[in-house]
């Protein structure tokens, strides 16, 4: 846990401080008082009765002693339970395909008042310009949008072609920005463990802030070494004992439930009264359809309570206070005097039914957020422009030659997990000995004119058609999977024509496509419109076979080399356990 940074009263002047104290003493009038409310006590359990008194952005007082205190406005909570605003400990807003402005509109009314964001998706495409845009969005947001400075751009040096670099010098220029809380996930964990100086330089430069980790399945001496380097947390754990061991060794555990990686059921049994200060909730990657239909962090809290019997105060603790403490955001995470007035009023605390949200001391109106979204997006000066530097392709670009009797490597998908298995299949004149094998290709889109890297994919469930996307972690080249080279080419050419996006092809025709004009990653449509388009894409994709729940998000991780076991980048097949390229044909 890193408490070396403290943003408490970071933006408060001495005059504002004096006004806050005057209201706390009862010598001045509050801006708001929330009456008829019970406050969930995250520290001791149980509830605290009495009003919540607000002056400016901060809570001036809590409890029955303020029952008769004067206020400019009073809010009748109608018996609601008040909890601190929810915090997502680790996410990439770009993976929602929404801009930061649209993301705020979609999630703030659900109680998500704070996010800790790593914008490495757009930084991989556009470099520092992408980070600068996220910083501009964070500066103007009502939501507390904090940034971790992207540490691995690209994810792994020499393994893929991406659109830009993000040097240590550029990273340092953002280190002292008021919205920056630390260094984002250090994905090259073998490099850290082996003591590569370039990586240690980054860790040293941000050591006074929070150092995010990324080490799926790591254990033994390697895990000890990774933690010894100063890494403080991990969001990639997917096994119970893996999570327990990381907690034992002093790591904080981010329990992730995204649209593709779903680890909450595996890790929730770890949460208890003792270790909950070291446990946090995060989504990493969650799409707009799920946000609209199921929720965001509110959905995770609901499942902890309903499915895993986590006590109320512990469930809400890991959704707020634990994360605030971990990142040194000591002005957040509790409903207490001097804390920022980020408050969620719940008509039903067990079902996480949000009645009203206040952030920075002001009530949130969802309709007003929506009405101002377009103007706020324009004010942020989004980095528009076509980032696809790739000529149209033909079916011959995906031609692979196979020899009967030979064995070939297959990327074997595990539905709703980011890890894959490395399997193999024997080819004969009748095809492969597995009927679930289809083709996968990755095409770099940054003007290097490389031939497509091609491979085999199993377990995805694609029986016909093709899917293509420019959302392809972390370099965001074009990834396509399909049963025929002709349909793969059609899908790729559609996303090239769109300037980036997602596409479903079946029966030789484009069935559905979604343009993503910002970096080939994000739409400028409203959250509702985007959710409807995602729904149409998923419906079209389901016609291609029994695919994963979120086929495009699952497909996006098939090219990420820092998650085992077998992946495909623009450079070829990559063994994520040996951290080395391998061949399509099995020769050993």
Swiss-Prot record:
InterPro entries: Adenine_deam, Adenine_deam_C, Amidohydro-rel, Metal-dep_hydrolase_composite, Metal_Hydrolase. Its EC number is 3.5.4.2. The keyword ATP-binding does not apply. The keyword Isomerase does not apply. Its cofactor is Mn(2+). One of its GO terms (molecular function) is adenine deaminase activity. Belongs to the metallo-dependent hydrolases superfamily. Adenine deaminase family. PANTHER family: ADENINE DEAMINASE, N-ACETYLGLUCOSAMINE-6-PHOSPHATE DEACETYLASE. Keywords: Hydrolase, Manganese. It is an enzyme of class 3 (hydrolase). It catalyses: adenine + H2O + H(+) = hypoxanthine + NH4(+). Pfam families: Adenine_deam_C, Amidohydro_1. It comes from Escherichia coli O7:K1 (strain IAI39 / ExPEC). Homodimer. SUPFAM superfamilies: Composite domain of metallo-dependent hydrolases, Metallo-dependent hydrolases. This is Adenine deaminase. One of its GO terms (biological process) is adenine catabolic process.
């Amino acid at each position: 846990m890193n408490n070396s940074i403290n943003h408490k009263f970071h933006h408060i002047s001495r005059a504002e401080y004096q006004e806050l104290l005057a209201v706390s003493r009862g010598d001045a009038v509050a801006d708001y008082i929330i009456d008829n409310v019970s406050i969930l006590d995250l520290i001791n359990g149980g509830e605290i009765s009495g009003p919540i008194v607000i002056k400016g952005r901060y809570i001036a007082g809590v409890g029955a002693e303020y029952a008769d205190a004067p206020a400019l406005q009073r809010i009748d909570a109608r018996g609601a339970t008040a909890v601190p605003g929810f915090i997502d400990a680790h996410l990439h807003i770009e993976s929602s395909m929404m801009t930061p402005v649209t993301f705020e509109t979609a999630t703030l009314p659900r109680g998500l008042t704070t996010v800790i964001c790593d914008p490495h998706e757009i930084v991989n495409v556009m470099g520092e310009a992408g980070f600068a845009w996220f910083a501009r969005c964070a500066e103007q947001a009502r939501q507390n949008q904090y940034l971790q400075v992207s540490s691995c751009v690209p994810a792994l040096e020499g393994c893929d072609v991406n659109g830009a670099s993000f040097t240590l010098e550029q990273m340092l220029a953002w280190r002292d920005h008021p919205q920056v809380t630390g260094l984002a996930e250090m994905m090259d964990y073998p490099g850290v463990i082996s003591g590569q100086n370039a990586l240690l330089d980054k860790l040293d430069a941000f050591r006074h802030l929070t150092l995010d980790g990324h080490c799926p399945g790591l254990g033994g001496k390697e895990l000890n070494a990774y933690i010894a380097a100063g890494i403080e947390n991990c969001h990639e754990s997917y096994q119970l004992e893996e999570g327990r061991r990381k907690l034992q060794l002093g790591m904080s555990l981010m329990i992730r439930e995204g649209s593709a990686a779903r680890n909450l059921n595996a890790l929730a049994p770890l949460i208890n009264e003792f270790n909950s200060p070291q446990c946090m909730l995060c989504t990493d990657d969650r799409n707009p359809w799920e946000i609209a239909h199921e929720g965001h962090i509110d959905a995770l809290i609901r499942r902890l309570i309903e499915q895993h019997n986590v006590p109320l105060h512990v469930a809400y603790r890991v959704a707020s206070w634990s994360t605030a403490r971990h990142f040194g955001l000591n002005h957040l995470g509790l409903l207490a005097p001097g804390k920022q007035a980020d408050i969620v009023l719940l008509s039903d605390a067990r079902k996480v039914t949000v009645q009203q949200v206040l952030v920075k001391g002001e009530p949130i109106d969802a309709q007003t957020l929506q009405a101002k979204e377009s103007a706020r997006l324009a004010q942020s000066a989004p980095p528009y422009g076509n980032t696809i530097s790739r000529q149209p392709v033909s079916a011959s670009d995906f031609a692979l030659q196979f020899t009967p009797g030979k064995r070939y490597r297959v990327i074997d998908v595990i539905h709703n997990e980011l890890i894959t298995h490395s399997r193999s299949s024997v080819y004969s004149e009748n095809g492969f000995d597995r009927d679930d094998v289809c083709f996968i290709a990755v095409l770099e889109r940054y003007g290097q004119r490389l031939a497509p890297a091609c491979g085999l994919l199993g377990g995805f469930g694609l029986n016909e058609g093709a899917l293509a996307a420019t959302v392809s972690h972390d370099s965001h080249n074009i990834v396509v999977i399909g049963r025929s080279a002709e349909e793969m080419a059609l899908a790729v050419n559609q996303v090239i024509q769109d300037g980036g996006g997602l596409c479903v092809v079946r029966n030789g025709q484009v069935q559905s496509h979604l343009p993503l004009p910002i970096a080939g990653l994000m739409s400028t449509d409203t959250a509702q419109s985007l959710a409807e388009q995602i729904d149409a894409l998923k419906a079209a994709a389901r016609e291609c076979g029994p695919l994963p729940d979120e086929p495009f998000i699952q497909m996006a991780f098939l090219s990420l080399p820092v998650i085992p076991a077998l992946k495909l980048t623009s450079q070829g097949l990559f063994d994520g356990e040996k951290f080395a390229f391998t061949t399509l044909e099995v020769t050993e």
